[in-house]
Amino acid sequence: MKRFLPFVIVAALLFPTFSHPVSAAEGQSAELATKARSAVLIERDTGAVLFEKNSQQPLPPASMTKIMTMILIMDALDKGKITLNEKVRASEYAASMGGSQIFLEPGEEMTVNDMLKGIAIGSGNDASVAMAEHLAGSEKAFVTMMNKKAKQLGLKNTHFANPTGLPVKDHYSTAYDMAMMAKELLKYDKITNYTGKYEDYLRQNTDKKFWLVNTNRLVKFYQGVDGVKTGFTGEAKYCLTATAKKGNMRVIAVVFGAETPKERNTQVTQMLDYAFNQYQTTPLYKRNALIVKASVSKGDQKKVNVVTSEPISILTKKGASTKDVTTEVKMNQDLKAPLQKGEEVGMLIIKKKGQVVSQSPLVSQGNVKEASWWHLFKRTMGMFNHSS
């Protein structure tokens, strides 16, 4: 059973606070994204907003929707629910998807690995629906999972109606929410093996070999870009959620509603340049870093490893000091079995000169099953005998 953090800590997670390195006034004054309907620029590890323009305005996200689709795929892989070599059969419905596709045929089987390529590189609508059906049983059930995950991430201005981004009523997101989704997706290090690849092939060694070229051209033309997802429909115009890493710093730039692909890429390029010229990050922890061993009551094991859920860094203006940084661990009270791998069990709070600069969930590294009454009885008797 999940135990919840005190309200103050939950609120701080959903609405992060940052120290002086992140100044809204500085970000707003920058001449960026002048030819986009909305935009946002964040640093990945802290989630700090470096620039924004109409970033909370709900708009159609087009194929950037597939960022959430990939989150759920990567989460299933991470938890061992599926494997990369597992075969996925395309239904007649999945194969019927229009728009960008990898031309799946009804009944055709591809591995999860190839489906991921088709989604991340080729923006395949058919591959997205095939994976949705494979994971949830139906597209409708998968959409429910998408919206549940959006709620878990605290995304208040996002609602999905399909896993593809094809135009449909009641399907929208914002630049800020899309950046938070990209932040979540990038927790999975291996995702950039797909989103960062400029070209690849499907159906190798067959007469139906299919060439994939990344719809995100910045992967090839901007050093450090290795994701994440483009989008286009007549209503949405040209959209892009991009990420780039230089040195220790990874940033995410989102643009909605550019008139041309060139304008879209120019807006994103300028935002990336701004981030790398103005800011720096100092890494503190990698994802899955062991923070503490916590006691678990009524579990088949007495303790569980508590680890970071994402990379954790300190963000400052270039040249600023990173001294006086401290960390504080706040565990959920009364951890009880069962616990699931990846379940939130506490919070790591990062402070600089006593002020909170970022906060990040701590999670269980593995599963802890509920102990049987016999197991608990033997444990109790062992403690009794030991004390005697």
Please place each PLM-identified region on the residue numbering:
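Positively charged n-region of N-terminal signal peptides that target proteins for export
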Residues: 1-6
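C-terminal segment of classical bacterial N-terminal signal peptides
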Residues: 14-22
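Residues in and immediately flanking transmembrane alpha helices
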Residues: 15-16, 79, 206, 286
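Active-site-adjacent loops and short helices of periplasmic peptidoglycan-processing enzymes
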Residues: 22-189
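Domain-terminus/edge residues, biased toward the C-terminal soluble/receptor-binding domains
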Residues: 155-156, 167-172, 176-388
